[in-house]
């Protein structure tokens, strides 16, 4: 028993004194001194600490933090010897859940209690559960950017901070609905207002504030954002986060699974807001026509939100709608397909055959587009000088599996081009296809996109891909104005109530156009979306965002093995992209589907990847830790394993196996 003494007061056992500070990591904090042995269990030490403090309160959330090892002592049955704790250990007895300030994708601020002792993956899952966001594996936390000191100190506007620190959810129990919202949000007017902030789009930002926000001016600037992601396998305490720190909650992985407007109002709104701010802060580029479409959708969404027409379904209707959908699905399954139709679908390989104009950029050439007879079959594109030569050898044949597909479209100028970057031994071979009209462009663009992923036009998603492309093009078409009306919008939209165009477009368009030039163009584009409901408009905005060439690419500055210059590595949900830092051109693309394995050498901070056909790639990271690249690759592979049948069940162990690392503190 610890603390045995002789008659003179000397200790005769192997016990020793252990000092534990009470509270958070403060050298001035109150401390207690305990008499322990190496065989003392952590649970017994916790009990002694509470007895020494001698204060009645709920201590169930408290645990011991070992400062030198940056480790929580959570295994209460372990002894001090097993942990390796000696008398010089700096230990702190404090709460595991502490307040943090979150800046959400909609740029609003929220204060809540988060776990500082669990891996970040679990912490984010708990935060998303509190905020009613499904599929938390798509999100993560990143550090807020450091504020630069300004020569002239400006008073920053005060922000409303929604407080959820007192909201506690029972573990393992799904939140119930009450009055159309999760029950824990209906406790007070403040929490109800917080739910409306989460689930409803925010008004357009102040144009002056928008101009003052930092914006990336180059690819290296875009790499800075992705250097701030926190490690998913470590807790907040291990990463130097303190109570009250500001963190950003963002969608990290651009692979959105089972997005259902009925069950995902918060997730849908926050995803829309992240897309909107990506465009407004120029994190992602778009053309002038596309910006007008995005501005028109924002204007429409803002109008519906302000009018209160948020399209909420009554709780009684929700079950009926679900029942109708289930019956419709059952009807489709029961109808099935005729045996002859199924046989045709198995034996017939879809093809595209048509005249297209083709251009292959080469050095020291002035040749432009030339017309060819083009045949698209499986994932292969072949072109001939004329239709008569088609059965013979083609002028050139290209396998588009693993290629980059980039749209080059100007609807008003009737320009419908597809830029293909096809992998070749020398790098990426560039070729342009010019289509005659929207219908032809949509069919060939959809075929190219599927082929780049190794899929053919027989894939069930081909028809929906064509329709999505046509829908996006229709948004960019000028609204139904009569001849000569030009820039004068007709109907109730003419006064443009509440329309400040500078709050709807990126700053580079603010500099290029005056407000009186932007307003009629936005209203003209608005005529194409004026009939959409709020949910439909948000979904259309997200779909248009997803169709942009640079969508879903996270940038990291790296140096490839054997190279003397820095380059950019783009990470998407299905591929890695090597980009020339000087000109921004794609040099090479590697598909995850062709990847055999990847390894990280934490000592020299190098990532090595092996692909099919004995292709090996190795690089060191310059702008961020190699852990971030490792986690992106593992995270996207994990997300590709999700299945609808499993619902929202997550294999956390698999995620941590794919993304966890052994980098030293």
From Swiss-Prot:
Residues bearing PTM Phosphothreonine: 589
Location of this chain's protein in the cell: Cell projection, Podosome
Source organism, top-level taxon: Eukaryota
Modified positions (Phosphoserine) in chain numbering: 8
Tissue expression profile of the protein: Specifically expressed in hematopoietic cells.
GO cellular component terms listed in the entry, alphabetical order: anchoring junction; cell projection; podosome
Modified residues (Phosphotyrosine): 11, 502
PROSITE patterns: FERM_2 (PS00661), PH_DOMAIN (PS50003)
Chief location bin: other
Domain FERM: 229-556
Gene Ontology molecular function: any one: integrin binding
GO biological process, one term: leukocyte cell-cell adhesion
Record bears the keyword Phosphoprotein: yes
Domain PH: 357-453
One Pfam family from the record: PH
Effect of residue 597 to A: Impairs ability to activate integrins
Reported phenotype of the disruption mutant: Mice suffer from fatal anemia, caused by severe bleeding and erythrocytopenia. Mice also show markedly reduced size and cellularity. Platelets cannot activate integrins despite normal Talin (Tln1) expression.
Keywords: Cell adhesion, Cell junction, Cell projection, Phosphoprotein
PANTHER family on file: FERMITIN 2-RELATED, FERMITIN FAMILY HOMOLOG 3
Role, per record: Plays a central role in cell adhesion in hematopoietic cells. Acts by activating the integrin beta-1-3 (ITGB1, ITGB2 and ITGB3). Required for integrin-mediated platelet adhesion and leukocyte adhesion to endothelial cells. Required for activation of integrin beta-2 (ITGB2) in polymorphonuclear granulocytes (PMNs).
Domains (record comment): The FERM domain is not correctly detected by PROSITE or Pfam techniques because it contains the insertion of a PH domain.
Quaternary structure (record): Interacts with ITGB1, ITGB2 and ITGB3 (via cytoplasmic tails).
Family under the similarity heading: Belongs to the kindlin family.
Protein's recorded name: Fermitin family homolog 3
Species of provenance: Mus musculus
């Amino acid at each position: 028993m610890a603390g045995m003494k002789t008659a003179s007061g000397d200790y005769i056992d192997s016990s020793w004194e252990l000092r534990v500070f009470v509270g958070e990591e403060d050298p001035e904090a109150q401390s207690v001194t305990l008499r322990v042995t190496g065989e003392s269990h952590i649970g017994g030490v916790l009990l002694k600490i509470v007895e020494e403090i001698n204060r009645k309160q709920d201590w169930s959330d408290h645990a011991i933090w070992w400062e030198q090892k940056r480790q929580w002592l959570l295994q209460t049955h372990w002894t001090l010897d097993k942990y390796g704790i000696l008398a010089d250990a700096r230990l702190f007895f404090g709460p595991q859940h502490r307040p943090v300030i979150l800046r959400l994708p909609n740029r609003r601020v929220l204060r809540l209690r988060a776990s500082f002792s669990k891996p970040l993956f679990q912490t984010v899952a708990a935060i998303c559960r509190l905020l009613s966001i499904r599929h938390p594996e798509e999100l993560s936390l990143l550090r807020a950017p450091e504020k630069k000191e300004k020569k002239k100190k400006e008073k920053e506007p005060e922000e409303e901070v929604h407080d959820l620190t007192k909201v506690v959810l029972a573990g393992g129990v799904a939140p119930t609905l009450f009055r159309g919202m999760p029950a824990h949000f209906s406790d007070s007017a403040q929490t109800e207002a917080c739910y409306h902030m989460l689930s409803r789009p925010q008004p357009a930002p102040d144009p002056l504030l928008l101009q003052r926000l930092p914006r990336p001016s180059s690819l290296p600037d875009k790499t800075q954002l992705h250097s701030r992601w926190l490690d998913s396998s470590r807790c907040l305490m291990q990463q130097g986060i303190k109570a009250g720190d500001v963190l950003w909650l963002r969608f990290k992985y651009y692979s959105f699974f089972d997005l259902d407007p009925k069950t995902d109002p918060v997730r849908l709104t926050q995803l829309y807001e992240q897309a909107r701010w990506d465009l407004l802060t120029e994190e992602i580029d778009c053309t002038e026509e596309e910006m007008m479409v995005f501005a028109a959708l924002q204007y429409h969404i803002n109008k519906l939100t302000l009018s209160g027409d948020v399209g909420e379904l009554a709780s009684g209707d929700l079950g009926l709608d679900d029942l109708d959908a289930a019956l419709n699905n059952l009807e489709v399954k029961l109808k099935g397909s005729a045996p002859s139709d199924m046989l045709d679908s198995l034996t017939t390989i879809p093809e595209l055959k048509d005249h297209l104009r083709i251009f292959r950029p080469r050095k020291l050439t002035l040749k432009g587009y030339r017309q060819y007879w083009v045949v698209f079959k499986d994932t292969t594109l072949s072109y001939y000088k004329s239709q008569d030569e088609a059965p013979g050898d083609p002028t050139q044949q290209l396998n588009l599996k693993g290629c980059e597909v980039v749209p080059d479209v100007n609807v008003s100028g009737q320009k419908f081009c597809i830029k293909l970057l096809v992998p070749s031994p020398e790098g990426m071979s560039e070729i342009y296809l010019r289509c005659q009209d929207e219908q032809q462009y949509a069919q060939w663009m959809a075929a190219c996109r599927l082929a780049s992923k190794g899929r053919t036009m027989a894939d069930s998603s081909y028809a929906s891909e064509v329709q999505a492309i046509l829908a996006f093009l229709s948004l960019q078409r000028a609204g139904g104005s009569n001849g000569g009306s030009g820039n004068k919008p007709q109907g109730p939209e003419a006064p443009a109530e509440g329309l400040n165009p500078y709050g709807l477009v990126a700053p580079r368009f603010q500099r290029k156009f005056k407000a009186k030039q932007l307003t009629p163009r936005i209203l003209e584009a608005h005529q194409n979306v004026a009939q959409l409901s709020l949910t439909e408009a948000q979904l259309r905005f997200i779909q248009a965002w997803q169709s942009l060439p640079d969508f879903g690419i996270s940038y990291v500055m790296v140096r490839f093995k054997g190279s003397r210059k820095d380059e950019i590595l783009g990470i998407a949900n299905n591929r890695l992209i090597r980009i020339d830092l000087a000109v921004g051109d794609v040099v090479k693309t590697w598909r995850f589907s062709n990847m055999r394995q990847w390894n990280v050498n934490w000592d020299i901070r190098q990532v090595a990847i092996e692909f099919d056909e004995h292709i090996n790639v190795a690089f060191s990271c310059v702008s961020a830790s190699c852990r971030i690249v490792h986690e992106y690759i593992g995270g996207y592979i994990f997300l590709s394993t999700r299945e609808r049948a499993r619902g929202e069940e997550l294999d956390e162990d698999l995620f941590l196996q794919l993304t966890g690392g052994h980098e030293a503190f």
